């Protein structure tokens, strides 16, 4: 390897150095504006997710009220039949009461599972 001759070495290219204001306007300002838009978008989506979750909870609450009303009506109907028995109707009423109680327990369990599911969804959306 031979030593370099100073005449053979090329002069380095000159790099344009921007003033701080130009550097800020050209490079940093667009990035900052884009980040602001992203943050605003995330805030809007968070609000929509919160409203969706609240809406689902409200729907579930209405469903539970309807189910409770139906179960109470079934119980009341069964009790009316029990109070005025007629022969074989006693046995049938007992069966219906048992079925109504089983259905009420199933519905209550389903309602608890729905509430737990919504809470999980709400927690996952908030994190």
Swiss-Prot record:
GO terms for molecular function: identical protein binding. Keywords: Coiled coil, Cytoplasm, Nucleus. The keyword Cytoplasm applies. It comes from the Eukaryota. It is found in: Nucleus; Cytoplasm, Perinuclear region. Its main location: nucleus. GO terms for cellular component: nucleus; perinuclear region of cytoplasm. Residues 87-118 form a coiled coil. Belongs to the MORF4 family-associated protein family. PANTHER family: MORF4 FAMILY-ASSOCIATED PROTEIN 1-LIKE 1, MORF4 FAMILY-ASSOCIATED PROTEIN 1-RELATED. Found in a complex composed of MORF4L1, MRFAP1 and RB1. Interacts via its N-terminus with MORF4L1. Interacts with CSTB and MORF4L2. This is MORF4 family-associated protein 1. It comes from Pongo abelii.
């Amino acid at each position: 390897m031979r030593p370099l001759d100073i005449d053979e070495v090329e002069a380095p290219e000159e790099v344009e150095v921007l003033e701080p204001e130009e550097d800020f306007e050209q490079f940093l300002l667009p990035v900052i504006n884009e980040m602001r838009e992203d943050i605003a978008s995330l805030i809007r989506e968070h609000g929509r997710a919160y409203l969706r979750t609240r809406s689902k909870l409200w729907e579930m609450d209405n469903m539970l009220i309807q189910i409770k009303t139906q179960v109470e009506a079934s119980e009341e109907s069964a009790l009316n039949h029990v109070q005025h028995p007629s022969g074989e109707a006693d046995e049938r009423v007992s069966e219906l009461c048992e079925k109504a109680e089983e259905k009420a327990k199933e519905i209550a369990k389903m309602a608890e599972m729905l509430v737990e599911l919504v809470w999980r969804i709400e927690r996952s959306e908030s994190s």
